[in-house]
């Protein structure tokens, strides 16, 4: 078995049979060579390092060297036949992006290889290559889960199976495995679906924690657990028993995991593993083929989300919004980098995750555009026909620039002082959510961790009450699916328990958001103490309904959450909310609708079939409602229209009111109750006559759509999705008639003479990390 050999600053190359300078790049390459030989069985005699190669990039012929090239046989290598596998290595410890390994894709294309391996010190990606689709690299290179072992390279069926094992296959396989794990617990331990889900989550995070501790180099397997458990039972548990502490090794692992995720509040302090050890071992056996530390975020995240969707039915189904609806609503509102996004009823976190991924994709696209720009800039400084040394120098320059730009896509905050990457800003400063259900708040955080972070702003808290970074006039985008049909009790109060007590968190948000945050925090403290603004003691100040103007009109949660969302938005902010259709057409909610029409513009109403939420347990027909809170200017316009309408109606009814007053003074109307009743009748007529005048004076078109199929059936299966057509039409409409001001991030990148990349915005200039 090969093992990397280093000595006195040198590292041994098995392929070239000589000692080389031990650089980080060379160490990465030699580790991979050992893996190719030891794990995959490829003979050293079939491999070449620094394989000389030339290719054309449109500007001329480039001469360069491939890191590793593998041929099927030694004879094919010596006769310079097509390569079987091409490998490109880099030293950096970052997520692999195929676009950065442009040389590797060029080598593989030029050498007509069947497989490409992209490898760095963090991860390894494998690609199958379809030469018929070259030069379209997006279609020609398909990411797969591995390469054939050497013993299988002539077995066409096995090779074809490996080429078909794409990431999508792995995702589906992983989802299926999670469901099998879930069934093991339900059958062995007789737990409810929700309790079984909690136990699966514990095991997943035990596994993730273990594999992160070893930086992805070890997978948590049953054999490892059995060996470690035996050592624990022999050496540690007897001592602990003498101290009055007795825990299974399974519980010890979970306690370590709770400690690792302590700041994320995923688990209660005294929470225990509640399944039998044989269930734990059976699940480890099913999961041991996956290294969750190394498995990509989209595989883990989407598999976990699909698992959630199949698990949360019945009572908890209300917390899960189908993916087709989440995608549609997010894409309608088109959140941008730098915008603050919130879901005050976040459930399993679907909207927050989609918004996170949606904005992250925009950031990645912009960074790729910057890479292309700087690459072109560097290439323009070199001759079209380059020597091999010149090409190596250019490649090194491009790699250095790419590495700096990649730091914008990594989590670096906490490691680099006050420097925040663009991904940090998105993860830690842009995404917020709350849920009053403790299981769902925890699930939302887990879901976001599985998808690649962004969970720090999620809290277990009543979504109608401010907490930490979630306060009024603060957000650009709200996406939510509030609970339907429930009522806020007339005696429900704001209590001391609703206040944040963690001084570190309070200090963090005070530093981040300043006076607006502090002001709302103080106001909430005042209400929790039952004090008026003037300091008088009045218990009604504590009533939750008194926080909301609509609380006088309705106690329905869906109504209160519409007002809550509008209050959370900045002027001009936009929201998408799932509502029962009754909110739009029930006569007893007319006043509620009029209230909202005086606070925001409707930008789209889309009626969807009841089928979409039947699997989640809903029994009412839903609509997707999109609104934009008035800008300051629109609010002035609306108030002006209301004032003119009132003046018009007042003038019309002034004679009638005068006549009524005169009659009362002449005592023709003897009872004040009769006078008040007639005055109220006139006021009601005035209010009714004002409505059409206001609508006419503040008129604007409202796009309305109705779909019969929204991508999901009553059983949760797939069907046609007409929401995609609505989205296309809305985008065209919004382009021709802009419905809101579209903010764009103001990042500017430049490169100095030392190849340092500088990021500038309106307030700061920083050097990107190397």
Regions found by a protein language model. Give the residues of each.
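Conserved S-adenosyl-L-methionine
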Residues: 319-480, 484-502, 580-581, 592, ...
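A conserved structural/catalytic subdomain of Rossmann-like adenosyl-cofactor enzymes
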Residues: 95, 148-152, 472, 477-770
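Structural motif
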Residues: 22-27, 186-201, 274, 293-296, ...
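Non-catalytic accessory regions of SAM-dependent methyltransferases
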Residues: 152-215
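A short, conserved, highly charged catalytic patch centered on acidic carboxylates
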Residues: 1-115, 123-161
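Long recognition/docking surfaces used for binding and targeting
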Residues: 205, 212-309
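Short amphipathic alpha-helical segments and their helix-coil junctions
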Residues: 6-17, 171-191, 282-288
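Class I SAM-dependent transferase core
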Residues: 184-185, 299-324, 330-332
């Amino acid at each position: 078995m090969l093992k990397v050999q280093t000595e006195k600053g040198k590292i041994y190359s098995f392929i070239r049979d000589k000692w080389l300078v031990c650089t980080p790049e060379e160490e990465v390459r030699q580790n991979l060579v050992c893996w190719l030989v030891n794990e995959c069985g490829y003979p050293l005699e079939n491999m070449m390092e620094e394989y000389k190669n030339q290719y054309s990039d449109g500007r001329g012929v480039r001469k360069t060297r491939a890191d590793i090239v593998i041929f099927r046989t030694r004879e094919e290598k010596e006769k310079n036949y097509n390569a079987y596998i091409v490998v490109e290595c880099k030293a950096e410890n970052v997520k692999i992006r195929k676009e950065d390994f442009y040389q590797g894709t060029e080598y593989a294309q030029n050498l007509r290889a069947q497989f490409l391996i992209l490898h760095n010190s963090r991860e390894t990606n494998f690609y199958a290559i379809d030469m018929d689709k070259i030069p379209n690299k997006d279609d020609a290179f398909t990411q797969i889960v591995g390469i054939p072992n050497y013993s299988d390279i002539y077995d066409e069926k096995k090779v074809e199976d490996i080429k078909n094992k794409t990431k999508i296959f792995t995702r589906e396989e992983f989802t299926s495995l999670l469901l099998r794990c879930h069934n093991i617990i339900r059958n062995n331990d007789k737990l409810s679906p929700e309790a079984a889900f909690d136990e699966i989550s514990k095991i997943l995070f035990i596994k993730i924690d273990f594999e992160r501790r070893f930086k992805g180099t070890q997978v948590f397997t049953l054999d490892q657990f059995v060996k470690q458990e035996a050592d624990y039972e022999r050496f540690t548990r007897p001592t602990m028993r003498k101290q009055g502490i007795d825990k299974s090794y399974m519980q010890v692992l979970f306690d370590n995991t709770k400690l690792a995720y302590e700041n994320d509040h995923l688990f209660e302090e005294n929470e225990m593993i509640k399944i039998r050890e044989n269930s734990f071992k059976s699940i480890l056996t099913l999961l041991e083929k996956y290294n969750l530390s190394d498995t990509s975020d989209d595989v883990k995240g989407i598999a976990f989300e699909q698992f959630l969707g199949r698990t949360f039915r019945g009572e908890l189904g209300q917390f899960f919004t189908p993916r087709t609806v989440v995608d549609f609503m997010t894409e309608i509102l088109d959140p941008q980098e730098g915008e603050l996004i919130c879901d005050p009823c976040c459930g399993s976190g679907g909207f927050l995750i989609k918004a996170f991924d949606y904005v992250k994709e925009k950031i990645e696209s912009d960074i790729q555009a910057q890479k292309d720009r700087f690459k072109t800039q560097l290439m323009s400084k070199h001759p079209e026909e380059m020597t091999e040394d010149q090409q190596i120098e250019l490649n090194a320059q491009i790699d250095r620039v790419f590495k700096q730009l990649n730091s914008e896509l990594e989590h670096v905050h906490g490691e680099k002082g006050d420097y925040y990457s663009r991904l940090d800003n998105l993860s830690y400063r842009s995404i917020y959510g709350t849920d009053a259900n403790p299981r769902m708040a925890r699930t939302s955080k887990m879901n976001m961790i599985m998808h690649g972070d962004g969970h720090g702003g999620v809290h277990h808290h009543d979504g109608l009450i401010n907490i930490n970074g979630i306060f009024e006039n603060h957000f650009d985008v709200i996406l939510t699916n509030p609970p339907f049909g429930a009522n806020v009790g007339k005696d429900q109060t704001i209590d001391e328990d609703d206040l944040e007590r963690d001084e570190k968190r309070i200090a963090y948000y005070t530093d981040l958001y300043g006076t607006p945050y502090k002001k709302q925090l103080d106001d909430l403290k005042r209400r929790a103490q039952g004090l008026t603004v003037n300091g008088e003691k009045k218990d009604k100040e504590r009533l939750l309904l008194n926080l909301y103007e609509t609380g006088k009109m309705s106690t329905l949660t869906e109504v209160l959450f519409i007002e809550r969302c509008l209050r959370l938005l900045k002027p001009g902010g936009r929201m998408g909310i799932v509502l029962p259709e009754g909110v739009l057409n029930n006569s007893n909610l007319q006043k509620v609708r009029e209230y909202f029409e005086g606070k925001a513009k409707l930008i789209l109403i889309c009626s969807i079939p009841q089928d979409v939420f039947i699997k989640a347990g809903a029994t009412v027909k839903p609509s997707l409602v999109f609104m934009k809170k008035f800008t300051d200017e629109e609010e002035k316009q609306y108030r002006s229209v209301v004032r003119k309408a009132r003046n018009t109606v007042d003038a019309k009814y002034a004679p009638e009111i005068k006549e009524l007053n005169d009659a009362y003074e002449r005592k023709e109307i003897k009872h004040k109750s009769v006078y008040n009743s007639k005055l109220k009748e006139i006021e009601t007529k005035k209010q009714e006559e004002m409505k059409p005048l206001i609508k006419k004076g503040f008129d604007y078109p409202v796009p309305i759509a109705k779909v019969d199929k929204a991508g999901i059936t009553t059983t949760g299966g797939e069907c046609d999705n007409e929401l995609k057509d609505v989205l296309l039409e809305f985008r065209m409409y919004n382009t021709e008639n802009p419905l809101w001001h579209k903010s764009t991030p103001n990042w500017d990148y430049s490169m100095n003479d030392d190849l340092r990349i500088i990021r500038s915005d309106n307030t700061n200039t920083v050097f990107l990390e190397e």
